[in-house]
């Protein structure tokens, strides 16, 4: 069973790996990825950086392409303010991805 954690407007879904997950149908995985298209996500990388951008595509090596991406460096003692660096289109190598969080879908609040 997958566990879901909501934090700061982002959702993290962790799926434990089992023998059954290796046999998961390609259609289910494809539909899951299609549901994430054009959604904002935060990707944490092995070097401590995080990228926030719009999910555009992935490949069989788990590389991810983000559009309108911004890079946030790991906060250090000398620089407490985390100002983003605008990257635009960014490719994140799959082997550098630690976690992916998808922004919650919220409907606009009209008064």
Curated annotation (Swiss-Prot):
It is found in: Cytoplasm. The keyword Cytoplasm applies. One of its GO terms (biological process) is negative regulation of apoptotic process. Gene3D superfamilies: 2.30.30.100. Component of the N-terminal acetyltransferase C (NatC) complex, which is composed of naa35, naa38 and naa30. Auxillary component of the N-terminal acetyltransferase C (NatC) complex which catalyzes acetylation of N-terminal methionine residues. This is N-alpha-acetyltransferase 38-B, NatC auxiliary subunit. The lineage of its organism: Eukaryota, Metazoa, Chordata, Craniata, Vertebrata.
